[in-house]
């Protein structure tokens, strides 16, 4: 049994298999996942686990060089945007319309579904390198 880090076997495997510039997405309970995109469903109840709990745990093991967020988060969920910026203070942020973010999920290695119930709590993480 793993002693530290992500203990969910599917999430751990996806993070371990990431290469430079690969994408991984994490999102709220309502985000539609395109057919063909691997979905890792962690949601067990409303707000359980939260988006930020999952993001913070993934960030312990994954080097991120850029993130993609929905433009709408700026007006519709500024508190969550602030949480994300605090978790990734030195990472480039790219905004796109929510409709484009949804389409971009087809390019991610997996989508991790949380129990989050706040709007636009979705992110695409672009993997960096550790050297």
UniProtKB/Swiss-Prot annotation:
Catalytic reactions of this protein: beta-D-ribopyranose = beta-D-ribofuranose
Zinc-finger in keyword set: no
GO molecular function, one term: intramolecular lyase activity
Entry keyword set: Carbohydrate metabolism, Cytoplasm, Isomerase
Subcellular location: Cytoplasm
Catalytic residues as annotated in Swiss-Prot or TrEMBL: 20
Top-rank taxon, per record: Bacteria
GO BP: any one term: D-ribose catabolic process
The protein's annotated pathway: Carbohydrate metabolism; D-ribose degradation; D-ribose 5-phosphate from beta-D-ribopyranose: step 1/2
SS bond partners: none
Assembly notes: Homodecamer.
Function according to Swiss-Prot or TrEMBL: Catalyzes the interconversion of beta-pyran and beta-furan forms of D-ribose.
Name under which the protein is recorded: D-ribose pyranase
Annotated organism of origin: Limosilactobacillus reuteri (strain DSM 20016)
